[in-house]
Amino acid sequence: NFENDFFILTGPAGSGKTEVIKNAVDICKEHNIGYQCLAFTGRAASVLRNRGLGNTRTIDSWIYQLNKESTFKEKFSDKDSFIFFIDESSMISNGAVVFENKEPELDFKLDEIMWSTYRHIPCKNIFFVFVGDSNQLPPLKHEYCPALDENYFIKRYGLRGASHELSKVHRQNLESEITKVAKNFMLQNNQSVKK
C-alpha cells in the first residue's frame, strides 16, 4: 500500500526530472507495479518515448481510451498497485475557460485525469506523480499551476501527498556559453545570482 496518494516533482529544465521518472519506472518493473507515463502534448510524449519511456501516451488519448474501451482496462486488472507519471503537469488546467468553436467552455483537465482513472482502473492502490517546472507560466486563465500545488489536491480531492523540488541544473556545463550569457544578464539586472 502507498502511504500517500500523490507526489509532485518540480524543477527547471535539465534538473533531472526525466531521469527520476526513468529510475522510478525501473523500480516499478522490478517489483511488478503497474505504471503509465503520460504527457500533456504529443511532442512531449514522443520525447519521453525517445528517452526510454516507451509506453508514454498523451493525457487526452489516455482519458479517451479509459472511457471508451473496456479491453484497455483489462490490462490493469492483474496489478494491485499502479503509478501514473504525468509530465508537463504545469500545463494542466482545471476550471479555465477555453473557446471551442467560438463557444466558451470550462476545461477541467485535471478533474478528468483524476476521476477517469479512479473510476476505471481496478487497482486497490493508485498513485500519481505530477512532474513539471513550477517556473513556467501557469495554464491559461490560471494564477498558478493546480497540478503542481500540493494544497490543491488536498482541498479538491481529499488526497494526501508530498512534493520535492530539484534545484540543480545538470544538463548544461556550468561554464557553457548559454549559462554565461544568462548569468551575465541576471547580474546586470541585479538578480541574486552566485558568481
Model features per residue range: what roles?
Residues N1-K195:
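Conserved ATP-binding/catalytic motifs of P-loop helicase motor domains
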